[in-house]
């Protein structure tokens, strides 16, 4: 009997796919108001055209910031460049396992080359925090307590594993994906980078289930996605605000069902 062999996964060669992955990687930095450097953009163009491999781009961007630590003052550009490079790698990687450990691994890969004290890559936070949200007029979402992070994620992931999306209507599908995404984001397990980590994980999860998704939404609407998550987890009756998943549903309808909902960031303000 002929032995069935494994095929080693090769680096993505399609320029259009590479362009899309870089666009998403750059676009997701918008959730924190970050923009990639011109140097990073130039490297990505060389990669898309086939002049450089991904490994060469990765090594060059890491070397660039290592050599210029003392002279480089724009830490925002460094973060955008390093994280975008890692996001490209994860999106182009064909492997995936549905587990909260994968979520931790993605966070580690995104932030491993940045300030260890600030990002604590791949580790759950060990303190509680708040974050002033412009969309909430400076108020904060109530995130999960740090001592319940792992227990909560285990529960949410185990519950999600039992879901059979093949039995769902389109409306049920959107509601469930929205609910799961909202839950893991509300936990906010990491010190920094929760939205970008969540966005990458959800994209990989949906692709692993065979859904055809409009990835360009993450390229163009990253800040809307983040603010929709905020509104899905915020209630304050004193200002007439109740948590609503309407905006997140609209995002996922466009992502999964190719609808054309108007994703206007201003609509999310309370």
Where are each of the predicted segments found?
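FIC/Doc superfamily catalytic core
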Residues: 1-270
């Amino acid at each position: 009997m002929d032995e069935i062999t494994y095929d080693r996964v090769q680096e993505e060669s399609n320029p259009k796919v590479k362009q899309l992955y870089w666009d998403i990687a750059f676009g997701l930095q918008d959730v924190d108001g970050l923009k990639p450097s011109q140097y990073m953009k130039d490297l990505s163009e060389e990669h898309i055209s086939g002049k450089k491999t991904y490994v060469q781009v990765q090594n060059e961007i890491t070397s660039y910031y290592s050599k210029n630590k003392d002279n480089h003052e724009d830490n925002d550009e460094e973060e955008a460049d390093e994280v975008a490079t890692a996001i490209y790698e994860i999106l182009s990687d064909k492997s995936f396992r549905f587990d909260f450990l994968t979520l931790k691994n993605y966070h580690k890969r995104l932030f491993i080359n940045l300030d260890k004290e600030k990002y604590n890559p791949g580790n759950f936070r060990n303190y509680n925090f708040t974050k002033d949200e412009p969309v909430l007029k400076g108020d904060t979402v109530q995130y999960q307590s740090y001592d319940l992070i792992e227990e909560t994620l285990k529960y949410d992931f185990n519950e999600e594993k039992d879901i059979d999306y093949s039995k769902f209507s389109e409306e049920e599908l959107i509601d469930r994906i929205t609910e799961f995404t909202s839950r893991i984001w509300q936990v906010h397990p990491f010190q920094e980078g929760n939205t970008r980590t969540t966005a990458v994980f959800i994209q990989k999860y949906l692709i692993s289930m065979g859904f055809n998704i409009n990835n360009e939404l993450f390229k163009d609407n990253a800040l809307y996605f983040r603010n929709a998550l905020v509104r899905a987890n915020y209630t304050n009756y004193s200002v007439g605000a109740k948590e609503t998943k309407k905006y997140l549903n609209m995002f996922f309808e466009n992502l999964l069902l190719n609808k054309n909902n108007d994703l206007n960031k201003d609509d999310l303000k309370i």
